[in-house]
Amino acid sequence: MATSQRKILVTSALPYANGPIHLGHMLEYIQTDIWSRYQKLRGHECHYICADDAHGTPIMLKAQQLGMAPEEMIAQVNKEHQQDFADFNIAFDNYHSTHSEENRVLASDIYLKLRANGYIKSKSISQLFDPEKSMFLPDRFVKGTCPKCKSPDQYGDNCDACGATYSPTELINPKSAVSGATPVMKDTEHFFFDLPAFEDMLKEWTRSGALQTEMANKLDEWFEQGLQQWDITRDAPYFGFEIPDAPGKYFYVWLDAPIGYMGSFKNLCDKRPELSFDEFWAKDSKAEVYHFIGKDIVYFHSLFWPAMLHGSGYRQPNSVYAHGYVTVNGAKMSKSKGTFIKARTYLDHLDPEYLRYYYAAKLSSRIDDLDLNLEDFAQRVNSDLVGKLVNLASRTAGFITKRFDGKLAKIADTTLTDAFLAKQEQIAEFYETREYGKAMREIMALADIANGFVADAAPWQLVKQDDQQEAAHQVCSNALNLFRILVTYLKPVLPRLALDVEAFFQQTLTWDSLGQDMAGHEIAPFKAMMQRVELDKVNAMVADSKENLQATSEPEAPKGPLASDPISDTINYEDFAKIDLRIARIVKAEHVAEADKLLKLQLDIGGETRQVFAGIKSAYSPEDLEGKLTVMVANLAPRKMRFGMSEGMVLAAGPGGSDLWILEPHEGAQPGMRVK
């Protein structure tokens, strides 16, 4: 048991109840599940809560298309979601729905408290109305050109291209996404949440350590733009909760969706009387609350949600952790290429433990996107899990069973065991801080050591010699004990494998038993625990995910960066070959006091340090850059500037200002390597 037991409530974002779970979704649930399982492994009281996000016009219209009542459709989707999660070994303590009595009561309670405290404003607004369907158009059912960056085909609440938020009436050339008709303006009374009233509180909270630095920096941009009152109303027809004292008016889905965390926990408390709802959600709560989310919903979880909680007398979350998107083979998930892979399609072909490990091996505490490279996926799983981890037991367990009555020897030389146990606090810290990739690398480095030990000792040779039986017993027992420690470290990531290993050792793997003396312990006969990833199964999964898209008669007009910034004139290879691109590590980054756009970087290029001034100040804080790998032009003539000598150039992509991203090589690249 942990020396000081924590009380923790952890959530993943609620999946929308109008479609299946895909591998992009699964990143978040795997990330959260690993963290929750780790906390439980350490002996903490941890409750992992989730629910389906089951309200809104999209669900109402989808149900109409299917000829079903919305309640019937969301119940069916909820069942499918829960089955997918269960088969991926996602261990929710409770999975509910926002379309529940608990959520209705809590949403009304929070709204009425906000209204009583003066944070709800009422005013008449002009809203877009579909004249063909005779309905007001919610923001996600209007499309047009973004009023900020002018990107086309954007929804009516926020722009996917630049991240700006706005009202549907601000769109340029709006169209109804329901009928395609041009909307007309019509007056209606709406209720607004007074978000600007919480600006000081939010500025303090967002810089309190509750958010990742990247998130806090992004929120600063929104503070600079000025917070706006938030429309929490939708007009009938709408599938959701009716607002108290306002017939025909409904809560916008983003009001009751995060309250769904509370609703699901209340549902769990009703099932388990020993749990106290107020112990976790009251304003003076000493329990911990953590939300894991995707970077696309930062605005709602980091501004609206804590403000709503504060204004209605509830506690705020300790932290909100955001992650990036999933790409497949270096590109956005694609139905035509078969890389838009549903969770169920994956499960039809491959072991969920494979994906859990691969995602863990690539996850960090940052908000970087994660690429699921299917070839690398197969190679890494086969190398790490089959070739290193399970192989350690398969090479030694048989000797224990056949020659030593299935019992482990008392290990005379504990040098390796001590070295493995010495890593537990470092691995624990990596799990706690969501640096799963670092934890996996640490664990696999230990697996390499263990396999090297077995290879050098060669127990298959020792057992053939009468005078080396005790040595063989020692080697195999030592190897299996190291295997037990490794699988205990990996238990949050590979829960099914951990169960198999527990059956093999005939004991539960716990963090507190890592250093247990296994002398005389009897093991069960070894059974195969994990199969290699076969590429034909990966290819079959991709084939099953493909959708044939009808070819268009005319080529699509260019979109995105190429439309405004076309490719330059062709150059000869000789011209390109003159440019010497090198991997560089940013050793130090600091502000340049006299410059609005520049940061001063000290770059290690493998045996040499360069000073470079880079115009990326609007996009990065110095602390975000230190330790990163990037790419620099190493043979650019030094340039004397007012602030000092610039000895090269770092490469970045984007239109400029805050929309710049430095190039970051994949892991394995080292300072000084040439980029070819």
From Swiss-Prot:
Q: What family does the Swiss-Prot or TrEMBL record give for this protein?
A: Belongs to the class-I aminoacyl-tRNA synthetase family. MetG type 1 subfamily.
Query: Looking at the UniProt record for this protein, which Gene Ontology cellular component terms does it annotate, in alphabetical order?
Result: cytosol
Q: Which GO terms describe its biological process?
A: methionyl-tRNA aminoacylation
Q: Which reaction does it catalyse?
A: tRNA(Met) + L-methionine + ATP = L-methionyl-tRNA(Met) + AMP + diphosphate
- Cite the entry's keywords alphabetically: Aminoacyl-tRNA synthetase, ATP-binding, Cytoplasm, Ligase, Metal-binding, Nucleotide-binding, Protein biosynthesis, RNA-binding, tRNA-binding, Zinc
Chief subcellular location? cytoplasm
Gene Ontology MF terms: ATP binding; metal ion binding; methionine-tRNA ligase activity; tRNA binding
Q: Which PROSITE patterns does its entry note?
A: AA_TRNA_LIGASE_I, TRBD
State the name under which the record lists this protein: Methionine--tRNA ligase
What's its EC? 6.1.1.10
| Residues spanned by motif 'HIGH' region | 15-25
Free-text function comment from the UniProt entry? Is required not only for elongation of protein synthesis but also for the initiation of all mRNA translation through initiator tRNA(fMet) aminoacylation.
Q: Which InterPro entries match?
A: aa-tRNA-synth_I_CS (IPR001412), Anticodon_Met (IPR041872), Met-tRNA-synth_bsu_C (IPR004495), Met-tRNA_ligase_1 (IPR023458), Met-tRNA_synth (IPR014758), Methionyl/Leucyl_tRNA_Synth (IPR015413), MetRS_core (IPR033911), MetRS_Zn (IPR029038)
Q: Which residues bind ATP?
A: K335
**What SUPFAM superfamilies is this protein classified in?**
Anticodon-binding domain of a subclass of class I aminoacyl-tRNA synthetases, Methionyl-tRNA synthetase (MetRS), Zn-domain, Nucleic acid-binding proteins, Nucleotidylyl transferase
Q: Which intervals of this chain are the motif 'KMSKS' region?
A: 332-336
Q: List the HAMAP family.
A: Met_tRNA_synth_type1
Its subunit composition reads:
Homodimer.
Give residues annotated as binding Zn(2+).
C146, C149, C159, C162
